[in-house]
Amino acid sequence: MKRAAMRLWTLNKGLLTHGRGLSQGSQYKISEPLHIHQVQVKLREIVGISTVWRDHVQAMEERKLLHSFLPKSQKVLPPRKIRDSYIEVLLPLGTDPELRDKYVTVQNTVRFGRILEDLDSLGVLVCYMHNHNHSTNMSLLSIVTVLVDKIDMCKHSLSPEQDIKFTGHVSWVGNTTMEVKMKMFQLHDDETYWPVLDATFVMVAQDSENKRPAFVNPLIPENKEEEELFTQGELNKSRRIAFSTSSLLKVAPSSEERNIIHELFLSTLDPKTISFQSRILPPKAVWMEDTKLKSLDICHPQERNVFNRIFGGFLMRKAYELAWATACSFGGSRPYVVTVDDIMFQKPVEVGSLLFLSSQVCFTQGNYIQVRVHSEVFSLDSREHMTTNVFHFTFMSEKEVPLIFPKTYGESMLYLDGQRHFKSMSTPVTLKKDYPVEP
């Protein structure tokens, strides 16, 4: 067993080229971006996992042997710079028709669910580059997405006829967690890249058995811009803690929120009767319970990640597509995603599980639709249902949408939670204007 561990530890060098051609400044450059297909290839090389499902048990057993090589303290790990993790990835939709078919919608736009999958893979690769050990190719760490903090869209829709470029880098590091900033750009006719999306993910490093947290390399900012990014990462952490502490699952609504719920309740009472039991809908309104949509997926090995659990990007894609269908059927027109936020990956989804998704509109305002998707799995072995994720999506409809009214106290809490997420939007009125950027 020890010999097998040493064999894994001393695999050939050079699989991961590290930040070639990076230059000083706030915009880092590399000589050539990775093709989108290379992201998964490199991840499997770094982790040392076979592409064949029947080999997964042996591969994971071999990875467990790396546990003894993990550092006992972060102090022994060399610090990294932002440039060390910076990466560019090309999605050549304009020049690859077969790839384009995978991403195109029937409305001739780009499938946002596929973009979520790419962002998840890119975020993991960025973190592996930050923690790259030059003495070996195979990483001792198992890095997974723990939180999608925020994804802000800058455009209504994307063209499937033009190339897309992703950039990403680590922006903040704790002891075992890392914040990753990613941007997405699309090529225009003038040969410049225009911004499309800003994303912030939080990743966690675990040991080779995916059981315990593992230390990651510290991050040292090189200039003022990087110091501001690092400070923002600290603020983001504090904001997440405050948001979690004030969760409606832990504390009662504020006095203002209680008044909102009471006003909603009063507006649904039937004026013809003097009763709290007789409820009617106001004009241009819909009961929250009537907006639900559900789906079921069997988690096949094809959708596994490099650690042989279900790929987080797949879960996000399925949740987004159900949320989009919910917003579309509710609003009566094609919705556009504006913001994705606060997606916490609470439990991993094992291959073979049954994945249940439940989506409903929980808040509306003007043309905006706030959709919540609850994800749970049913294990065929343990016969238990477990919540794995809660997803929050903000859509904008082409026309004004009906108001949402809760009936029960539980639905009222969903309404307030949806309102909180809506208010946290970075661009609550209109999408940002286009402007060219050279990524």
Curated annotation (Swiss-Prot):
CDD domains: BFIT_BACH (cd03442). One of its GO terms (cellular component) is mitochondrion. GO terms for biological process: acyl-CoA metabolic process. It is found in: Mitochondrion. It is an enzyme of class 3 (hydrolase). Residues 85-209, 289-401 form the HotDog ACOT-type domain. Gene3D superfamilies: Hotdog Thioesterase. InterPro entries: HOTDOG_ACOT, HotDog_dom_sf. Its EC number is 3.1.2.-. Keywords: Hydrolase, Mitochondrion, Repeat, Serine esterase, Transit peptide. One of its GO terms (molecular function) is fatty acyl-CoA hydrolase activity. Residues 1-21 form a transit peptide. Catalyzes the hydrolysis of acyl-CoAs into free fatty acids and coenzyme A (CoASH), regulating their respective intracellular levels. Active on long chain acyl-CoAs. Belongs to the acyl coenzyme A hydrolase family. This is Acyl-coenzyme A thioesterase 10, mitochondrial. It comes from Mus musculus (Mouse). The gene is Acot10.
